[in-house]
């Protein structure tokens, strides 16, 4: 049985730490802590990798009892080359069914998240790189909003390259990091549901 693979997209290195473009990496690191994940550098994958076991507790339902092995991956390539870290792990369309990629999305307001499946990259370079590397769009993603919003909570998407760069390369404020930590609990539960009950159930419950 092939492992589940959860990927958190971002750029390696200190200068990118805490930036909005690193949202996937930040969230997967927080989720890893919940599982006492021990990260190790995998030179072959050019990534930080941790092995955990995920699943609902046995009491949730006898049928769902038991936990499944999951590989957490934080690519150490730059965003545009993320596929290099994923290609050796996802070798078929079938194995892509157990892949989830967590990443930042400018088309959604900060603090929101959505599970999607089998969609285009939407211009996200990291996602584009993974799609090219594994030759399929048929995998799950957790899109996490990073765009500013109006006082009424509507999306205020930046327009123009400079404005976009300013948002994605800007660092999260401490109060925004608290919002991400809260969001990580919801995403962690969604990932557990995905592993134990399948994608449809996770989408119905968390979207």
Where would I find each of the regions flagged by the language model?
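Conserved TIR/SEFIR loop-to-helix hotspot centered on a Trp-containing motif
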Residues: 121
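Active-site YXXXK catalytic motif of short-chain dehydrogenase/reductase
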Residues: 124
